[in-house]
Amino acid sequence: RVLFPCFFGSALKMDGIDEFVAGFERYVREPEYDSEFGARIYKVSHDVQGNRLTWLKVTGGEFKAKTMLSGTARVGADLGESKIDDDGMWHEKADQVRVYSGAKFTTVDSVVAGTVCAVTGLTRTFPGAGLGKEPDGVNPVLQPVLTYTLLPGECDIHACLVALRELEDEDPLLHVVWQPHLEEVHLQLMGAVQLEVIQQMMHDRFGLDVSFGPGGILYKETIAHPVEG
């Protein structure tokens, strides 16, 4: 970039709006897209019916509903019944293609390059993943450093695990680990603030009032012999 435009005005008073629109039209270039299909996933969420939504931007070609897609399986993810080949790739069919406007959406048959949409029917996608010609993005620089034990109280621990798996699906910085021999759920995350957010979301979205044990350091390596640091 060699030009950084600066505009002054007020939308409330309709002051400077015409100049802004004219400058926007003059200086902004319309992207040029390839004919080969590509898309970048930037978010995963769930609608009020519990349908899993994969949010993506089409970066090339055309994307149609019912298209068979392939992608790299997320490291450490529970693959369930998804079909995974020898190269660690999943294969699933996209169901609905939705174009949202606020909370409302329109179901469409296809979208072209440059369109942002939400797709149902995909269960193994994750934020940052690429589809088609798009490569996967780099892993987040920040990684969970603390581990906490879930204290379900009077809540069913398996219901808590299902809810936490859904939150893990949406947040790349949350890792949920089920310890079957202990019948415990462990959370790997960034710290107390993220823990408070998760606790509130468990209450608001799932009606589960839970707490957590004291945090511990998540060690990435095991010391093989005594050393001096």
Set out the residue ranges of the language-model regions.
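Structural and coupling elements of P-loop NTPases
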Residues: 1-229
